[in-house]
Amino acid sequence: MQGAEVRCGGAEHLGPAGTFIAPTVLTGVRADMNVVREEVFGPVVVAIAFDEPEEVVTMANDTEYGLAASVWTESLSAAHRLAADIRAGTVWINSHSMYDASLPIGGVKQSGWGRDSGHQAVENYLETKTICAVI
């Protein structure tokens, strides 16, 4: 884990939901560590201390990936400000991995282009034809 401290979890876990690691919280994490720089597909929280909310946005956006993010706070207005500035396809507030088939799913940057689900995805299945005529 490149020096990060496993505060809880961390054991291998082949769960029914396709997870490969038990829910894990990591602390003592630096911005240059792989667990911060790469996409982590698992129930992993990377806890990094910060002084100002702007630092959170800078850290969150300082990666080539942007599939999803979670903002956890008591201040809903602060959460909305952060969510608007974080470059990710989905930002959850005080939750994670909430899905609804009516909402678009997709990332930004190297995490993908386009959207699945929602009305945006319907365009992928349409074959639009343009017909022009001189009358």
Residue ranges and their predicted role:
Residues 3-12:
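Short secondary-structure junctions
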Residues 13, 20-135:
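Conserved C-terminal structural/oligomerization subdomain of aldehyde/semialdehyde dehydrogenase
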